[in-house]
Amino acid sequence: MSKIYLDACIVIYFVEKHLAYASKIEALINNLGMNDALCFSPLIRLECLVMPLRTNDTTLQNLYESFFKTQKMLEMTVEIFDKATQLRADFNSLKTPDALHLATALHHNCDEFWTNDNRLNSIAPSLVKNVLIT
């Protein structure tokens, strides 16, 4: 079983059916095995739900909630925040949300971290995959 941590951009592109990216993400998801798990954190949920809440778009909010109900939410513990703190100290360019995402994926032994952010690959190249590079 593989555990795949989804960056917020991947969830947003997929749920909102981004013209350039949604079909590629859907194909990647369809190629996963039955026992593979798509994972997210409470921080991903926060990042995805801000705009629908801000704009009072209940339809989009419901789409996100439906998506999250079918995936695996990973807890964010004090140990994860400590690991994120160390990552921030080690990598000057790393922002706090990205440090938390990486720390969460590492802590929970995720096999891959799907993103569209090339900067993260230099920090954890064996984990981070820019799945939207064409």
Regions found by a protein language model. Name each.
Residues 1-40, 52-63, 132-134:
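Short, well-structured N-terminal submotif of metal-dependent ribonuclease cores
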Residues 1-3, 28-30, 102, 106-134:
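Acidic, PIN/NYN-like endoribonuclease modules and their adjacent C-terminal/linker elements
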Residues 8, 42, 98-102:
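Conserved glycosyltransferase catalytic-site signature
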Residues 17-18, 51, 87, 126-127:
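Residue-level signal for well-ordered alpha-helical positions
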Residues 67-70:
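Extended, non-globular alpha-helical segments
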Residues 72-118, 122:
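Active-site neighborhoods of divalent-metal-dependent phosphate/nucleic-acid chemistry enzymes
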